[in-house]
Amino acid sequence: MSAISVGQAIILGVVEGLTEFLPISSTGHLKIAEGLMDIQVDDKAVVGFTAVIQVGAIAAVLVYFFADIRRFVTAWGRGLANPAARTNHDYTFTWWVIYATIPVVLVGLAAKPLIDGPLASLWVVAASLLAGSALMWFADQYGRHKRGEDDLSLPDAMIVGTSQILALLFPGFSRSGATISTGLIRDLDRVAATRLSFFLSIPALTGAGLYELKDAVGGGVSAAPLAVGTVVSFFVAYASIAWLLKFVARHNFNAFIIYRVAVAVLLAGLLAGGAINA
């Protein structure tokens, strides 16, 4: 019997697609949803399943930003083949994304027992939701938001990419919340910070999904729930990306901050009352 049913996979796919790129924590919401459905959140197969369905969300990024990604890959390939083409900003930016992914990969491999064990607790999710909200508020209030995508530098990419470690270690912090907030603190405007967050998500989440695939399949999740959850997350994530880019062009992040705090308080109350298990 599969550790996750097709019906549960649909629900988790919707949650993943809605929350992966919104700064509200997909991992936190997935763990909450799993807890409410009496799915063991620290089960190896379940952890693997949640990582694999992220690939659907990443596929949505690849489709949505296909023109940008094709431009980056083309420039990178030309630069590798021809040293004279290495002055192209797209060639340089592609290397920045690769460099900026290295820290989170190293920490992810080294800290995996902690990530899959004690740090998977829903109490950690509640605390991380609050901590991430504080960072978002600070970044939104005190960042100058004056630098666009053309002003990006290697330090920007490295600092923003390294901030993904916060979400890796503390589910509830939010990968997109951490990266966008760090970008704002670096004085990027909201659209530039959000687009950088999307591009950094591609290698990080794809690698995590492929790495965890063996645990999801070998641990007792059948192919049907994996496929359904991934496909659902793709379509929902695509709509979420389009909405978020329009939203950040005109609004601050106060609505997300309020929502995160409310979810953290509600989750803490449910845990304290024994309605769900940590």
From Swiss-Prot:
The chain crosses the membrane at residues 46-66, 91-111, 119-139, 153-173, 191-211, 225-245, 256-276. Its EC number is 3.6.1.27. The keyword Cell membrane applies. It comes from the Bacteria. Its main location: membrane. Catalyzes the dephosphorylation of undecaprenyl diphosphate (UPP). Confers resistance to bacitracin. It is an enzyme of class 3 (hydrolase). It holds the Pfam family BacA. The keyword Repressor does not apply. GO terms for molecular function: undecaprenyl-diphosphatase activity. Belongs to the UppP family. PANTHER family: UNDECAPRENYL-DIPHOSPHATASE. It comes from Frankia alni (strain DSM 45986 / CECT 9034 / ACN14a). The gene is uppP1. This is Undecaprenyl-diphosphatase 1. GO terms for biological process: cell wall organization; peptidoglycan biosynthetic process; regulation of cell shape; response to antibiotic. Keywords: Antibiotic resistance, Cell membrane, Cell shape, Cell wall biogenesis/degradation, Hydrolase, Membrane, Peptidoglycan synthesis, Transmembrane, Transmembrane helix. InterPro entries: UppP (IPR003824). Bacitracin is thought to be involved in the inhibition of peptidoglycan synthesis by sequestering undecaprenyl diphosphate, thereby reducing the pool of lipid carrier available. It is found in: Cell membrane. It is a multi-pass membrane protein. GO terms for cellular component: plasma membrane. It catalyses: di-trans,octa-cis-undecaprenyl diphosphate + H2O = di-trans,octa-cis-undecaprenyl phosphate + phosphate + H(+).
